[in-house]
UniProtKB/Swiss-Prot annotation:
Subcellular location field: Membrane
Membrane-crossing residue ranges in chain numbering: 11-31, 104-124, 227-247, 310-330
Region (Disordered): 145-197
A GO cellular component entry from the record: membrane
Protein name: Putative uncharacterized transmembrane protein DDB_G0285049
Topology term for the membrane: Multi-pass membrane protein
Domain of life the protein comes from: Eukaryota
Biased composition (Low complexity): 147-194
Lineage: Eukaryota, Amoebozoa, Evosea, Eumycetozoa, Dictyostelia
Record keywords: Membrane, Transmembrane, Transmembrane helix
């Protein structure tokens, strides 16, 4: 089995890129799900001042923790408006695990995506080169044979003309000698033409095995690549699918701990540190009210985010690659070694003139062997 030839320098650069992206992905965090909702608090403060506090929250779930981006709009009865935006990170589990499982899965997803896309241009280039080389070599030999044939014909014509001139200038030869000379010249011409055809047969004999060997090498290397890529895509598909289920399950646990989606009520209070909350309240959310109850919880919605779409793209790419590779393996099994010479012309995709010349050459070859 023949392996694909890969330049060591290019392979080293590719491995460095993969390692760099893997390391970089550990510093990146892509949310899998996002939740948007609004909380409106009506609070009575001293001097009978009513404060309407609207909290616009966006929770981005990362599997083991989430990130709260909230925006406050406060409006008092004296038409005093305030707008405050804060970003708060809240860990529903142990803080030591929040940067491990999720970022490993993210790194695996990014690395697998690049590793699956990068070899595709290499296969296309190799396929084009391997298919074009034998065709060009064969056409060049046919063109060279045509040039040699034309040169031989010109030489023969010149020799015939010289012989005819010599025969015409020689008054001592009789008609019988002239006839003999003409017959000899014709025999010589026929012998020359036979030599040309023998050379054409040598072109076919030398060219077709070369093309056959190159096609066998290409098919062997392509088969090795296809089978290897099929195994890689299959394993990557299973790992990505498993990791997606794991992350989704962790997100659902986080949602159940914090909220009741059906009732749209948060079950667990979020206690932020005093550094983030200047008032130091352990409220359901950061707020400026003195109560822990939320009178209105509305516009709740949550759905997939960038990390989930990244996993989905990886799964779709794996599925598409597996289907295409299986199709190529099935169709490649039909590309057996040609038994008849004319089948090579279908693979070479020659022009009509080259096809006619090739058939004439193979016909002369069969006549010569018979």
């Amino acid at each position: 089995m023949v392996f694909l030839k890969v330049d060591c320098s290019k392979l080293f650069i590719f491995l460095c890129c993969i390692m760099s992206i893997t390391i970089l992905s550990f510093s990146l965090v892509f949310p899998y799900y996002e939740s948007d909702f609004i909380i409106v608090n009506h609070t009575d403060i001293r001097n009978n001042t009513i404060v309407i506090n609207k909290e616009f929250h966006q929770f981005q779930f990362f599997g083991t923790y989430f990130y709260d981006i909230n925006r406050f709009e406060m409006k008092t009865s004296f038409n005093q408006a305030y707008l405050i935006t804060k970003r708060v990170s809240y860990d529903s589990y142990d803080s030591s695990t929040k940067n491990s499982v999720f970022q490993i899965i993210t790194s695996m997803t990014l690395t697998s995506l690049i590793a699956k896309v990068f070899p595709i241009p290499i296969l296309i280039v190799n396929m084009y080169i391997n298919l074009q080389k034998p065709k060009r070599r064969y056409l060049n030999q046919i063109q060279q044979h045509h040039n040699n044939n034309n040169n031989n014909n010109n030489n023969n014509n010149n020799n015939n003309n010289n012989n005819n001139n010599n025969n015409n200038n020689n008054n001592n030869n009789n008609n019988n000698n002239n006839n003999n000379n003409n017959q000899n010249n014709n025999n010589n011409d026929n012998n020359d033409n036979n030599d040309v055809l023998d050379g054409a047969n040598e072109v076919v004999i030398n060219t077709m095995p070369t093309y056959e060997v190159l096609m066998e090498r290409y098919q062997s290397s392509a088969s090795y690549y296809l089978i290897t890529q099929l195994v890689v895509n299959g394993v990557s598909f299973m790992i990505t699918l498993f990791s997606t289920f794991v992350v989704t399950h962790r997100i659902s646990i986080t949602m159940k701990l914090l909220t009741s989606i059906d009732e749209q009520i948060f079950n667990k209070p979020l206690c932020y540190t005093k550094n983030l909350d200047p008032f130091g309240y352990c409220n359901s959310f950061i707020g400026f009210s003195s109560t822990t109850s939320d009178e209105n919880f509305m516009d709740f919605s949550w759905g997939p985010s960038f990390g989930w779409y990244l996993s989905l793209c990886s799964l779709c790419l794996d599925s598409f690659s597996i289907i295409v590779i299986i199709f190529l393996i099935i169709t490649e099994g039909k590309l057996k070694k040609p038994k008849q010479p004319h089948k090579f012309t279908n693979i070479l995709n020659l022009s009509d003139m080259d096809l006619i010349n090739y058939r004439l050459l193979t016909l002369n070859q069969r006549i010569g062997t018979d």
